[in-house]
Amino acid sequence: ITIYELHLRYYYQGLAYSGFPYVYHTVGSAFAVKALSYVKAGGMNRKQAGEDFYFIQKLVSSGGYFNMNSTTVYPSPRASSRVPFGTGASIGKLSAYQNSTLFTYNFLAFKELGIFFGLIDRFFECRPDELDGHFNLIPHGLRLFLNEKEWIEKLTEIKNNTAGIHSFKKRFFAWFNMFMIVKYLNNVHLVYFEKKSVEVSASELLEARGIIFESREPLDFLLYYRAMEKNG
């Protein structure tokens, strides 16, 4: 469970590093929501798995959410085969093999997202007929994921329905939301990047932030990542 929780917190910090504006734990979260906000977001779907993920990614884009750091909720180290992903499935796989490790998203994928999000102002400022040239500025892994024609059509639609950079960004991230990010991360690790052990990836993210972490023990990483999140 230590390794899996580190994976969740590494993913959270990877999103924060990329500059994604709606960073929130969408797997293993304990959350509460007001009834009116629940209704406005369309409610929770009836999928048998991932319903928290789908609901939260709709909810957080409206803003007004916050994290409670005055208490702690620990994921349960309980194996489960109810669904093929998530805490229960991961614990089951890790428990089945002695000395096994968990492979997580390559930190370079989050760096690609950071470059991509850093181009948003240029996407807004350019003319529609310049979008094809701007597509070539997008990092290679993301270009493999995005269909150029569909990307140009989507950006043109967003530009035609926004008057300023604030509304442009809001529409952009309503499209390239957490669901799209997960799809990209899963795709890019099939065709371009290789996953790495969660300890290596956690270390690389810290190094990118100028933090040299001596220990390679998962628990030490986890305690540090918990503190990072709590302290903002």
What are the residue ranges of the model-derived segments?
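Catalytic donor-sugar/metal-binding loop of nucleotide-sugar-dependent glycosyltransferases
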Residues: 47, 59-74, 80
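Short, well-ordered alpha-helical scaffold segment located
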Residues: 36-37, 72
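PAPS-dependent sulfotransferase catalytic core
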Residues: 78-99
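Acidic donor-binding loop at a coil-to-helix junction in glycosyltransferase catalytic cores
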Residues: 47-54
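Conserved donor NDP-sugar-binding/catalytic core segment of glycosyltransferases
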Residues: 1
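A recurrent flexible, glycine/aromatic-enriched loop bordering the glycosyltransferase active site
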Residues: 9-32
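Terminal low-complexity segments of carbohydrate-biosynthetic enzymes
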Residues: 93-232
